[in-house]
Amino acid sequence: MPKEYTSVSKISGPLVLVENIENVKYGEVVEVKLANGEIRQGQVLEAQEGAALVQMFASTQDLSLKGMRIKFLGHVLEINLSPEILGRTFDGLGRPRDGGPEIIPQKRMDINGSPINPYSRAYPQEFIQTGISAIDGMNTIVRGQKIPIFSGAGLPHATLAAQIARQARLLNEEEKFAVVFGAMGITFEEANFFIENFRSTGALERTVLFINLANDPVIERIATPRFALTAAEYLAFDLDMHVLVILSDMTNYAEALREVSASRKEVPGRRGYPGYLYTDLATLYERAGRIKGKKGSITLLPILTMPEDDRTHPIPDLTGYITEGQIFLSRELHRRGIYPPIDVLQSLSRLMRGGIGEGRTRKDHGDLSNQLYAAYSRGLEAKELAVVLGEAALTEEDVQFLEFAEAFEMEFIKQGEYENRSIFETLNLGWKLLRRLPRASLKRIRPEYLDEFWGKEDAS
């Protein structure tokens, strides 16, 4: 039976120092009983011989050293799991926030989990359709991939995240597909937007939400993505489901990590973030993937807002080293009213080749994508030249590529918030746009594909 201690020696901000204790471990859950009988929870941040530093999950402003009783429960944070979590909304610590009952567990799991052993990993493949042309056609996401969305303050990443969560599916309808959504440090309005969006579109029944609000404790923000990923591991590897995990906003998570690090008086690293930021992010991102011999998979889509749109900031910089590409949102496209404002030239899916082609999407997908990239890039070069020298200085072919680039942005990249394009609609739209250009200029596409698809209005 856990012992109770009254040896609290100091309260500093959200931290409580407990002395004269024994057999306490890092990450252990703590129960704090106040003099008035109220019970609060915390977690051991640091354990040394005879002392422990506890981070509270609630405010410490009204705490007093007198009458406090501390009980170390002997286990780390765990989550109750069963198939009933689908369709439910929880707070950042896995407690129901939708008014529903507590989950009766079929299994309890430690939220810290562990990264997948590289030897046990299966190579990510199999196309995931998001219904968004700039992603499906140009930066394809495959099952088991981890690919972040790099955004900026004021850009519609929340709307894009909700759209992906609603529309994402495998082309094989027989596969069981679920979405786990972990929100960190968001406002009440944003939380309500996600919940109502999923409910009104019928996507809630296959979704699990973990929501940490901006006014919730910082330590809870650090736990939220771990609760979300643990739920995803259960759905994927125990129930054989294919799970898409969306984590938003990882910048709020990193800020919380910096705040906790500062409260512990740790030596800061780049821009005040702890030196272990890279390692900490890796413990989250590397939990995504496929495991040999398991039917299920976890695909991870973390969203982060780059402070001051700075892609060299430690958070996007370190994220890029761990993940397998990025989807980049453009402020310039957003300013021109293009949604989703995905900058396809700065975006990249490193595992795209494993998820496209004959038997997965369509045999012309790879060549078509390469040609669209090349044509769009040349069109933007012509646009820059026209700004400097005027359109009169452009050749006839330059003008054609310039018009193609404008049409590509307005017809291919731009689409409605509730517009769900199939991969075949996306590919056919790409061919439709390429017909604006001389056939001889399409040098990235094999002649046999040109012969087969150039004259077809719709192919499947």
Swiss-Prot record:
Positions in coiled-coil regions: none
GO term, biological process aspect, one: proton motive force-driven plasma membrane ATP synthesis
Molecular function in Gene Ontology: ATP binding; proton-transporting ATP synthase activity, rotational mechanism
Entries under CDD domains matching the protein: ATP-synt_V_A-type_beta_C, ATP-synt_V_A-type_beta_N, V_A-ATPase_B
Gene3D superfamilies: 3.40.50.12240
Assigned protein family: Belongs to the ATPase alpha/beta chains family.
Protein name (Swiss-Prot/TrEMBL): V-type ATP synthase beta chain
